[in-house]
Amino acid sequence: MQSVKCVIVGDGAVGKTCLLVSYTTNAFPTEYVPTVFDNYSATVMVDSRPINLGLWDTAGQEDYDRIRPLSYPQTDVFLLCFSVVSPPSFENISSKWKPEVSHHCPNAPCLLIGTKIDIRDEQTQTNKTCDKKIEPITSEQGEAKCKDIGALKYIECSALTQKNLRYVFDEAVRAVININKKEKIKRKSCLIF
């Protein structure tokens, strides 16, 4: 069975742990406890193939900048996470997270993940009656950032409602499988003159 190591990075409190807990247990965590480092594992079926998916949760706080990269070796795919209701976390994708993972794992594919879309959708409804100073990140902004940083795909999701949750991890696995297919084709290609 093929194994895939998926590391999740992003600012503190953007919903990385909720994403993993909701995906692996179908339950949404009720309280926020900052993560230092945590591991989850699941056997999943993607495109009719069993995959041992190793999920690595990381600390987003600056206090852990020096130890976080210890989880990066042999990473197959990164999920760069930001909250769609936190513009600073969105900006940190290009100023901190993409440069950090590119420095340590220059060849690993990245997916850009916008979390907490349930809150954005809720705010969109309530903004009609109240004046908010912080505008949530739109899908179009996420797509533009995805292209800007060279991520393979942009996906929005909600750990609370589980909207697009399985899709996030299926696409992470597909990113690795597709790269492995391309490498096998390159290795099998042989020209004799």
Swiss-Prot record:
Regulation of protein activity: Regulated by guanine nucleotide exchange factors (GEFs) which promote the exchange of bound GDP for free GTP, GTPase activating proteins (GAPs) which increase the GTP hydrolysis activity, and GDP dissociation inhibitors which inhibit the dissociation of the nucleotide from the GTPase.
Binding positions for GTP per the UniProt entry: 13, 15-18, 32, 35, 60, 116, 118, 159
Membrane topology: Lipid-anchor
Gene Ontology biological process terms in this record: actin filament organization; cortical cytoskeleton organization; establishment or maintenance of cell polarity; mitotic cytokinesis; regulation of actin cytoskeleton organization; regulation of cell shape; signal transduction; small GTPase-mediated signal transduction
Cysteine methyl ester, modified sites: 190
Record field: catalytic activity: GTP + H2O = GDP + phosphate + H(+)
Main localization (coarse): membrane
Any one annotated GO CC term: plasma membrane
Motif stretch (Switch 1): 26-37
Cofactor: Mg(2+)
Binding site for Mg(2+): 17, 35
UniProt keywords, alphabetically: Cell membrane, Cytoplasm, Cytoskeleton, GTP-binding, Hydrolase, Lipoprotein, Magnesium, Membrane, Metal-binding, Methylation, Nucleotide-binding, Prenylation
Family: Belongs to the small GTPase superfamily. Rho family.
NCBIfam families in alphabetical order: small_GTP
Functional summary from the UniProt entry: Small GTPase which cycles between active GTP-bound and inactive GDP-bound states.
PANTHER family in alphabetical order: RHO FAMILY GTPASE
The protein, known as: Rho-related protein racB
Record organism: Entamoeba histolytica (strain ATCC 30459 / HM-1:IMSS / ABRM)
Lineage: Eukaryota, Amoebozoa, Evosea, Archamoebae, Mastigamoebida
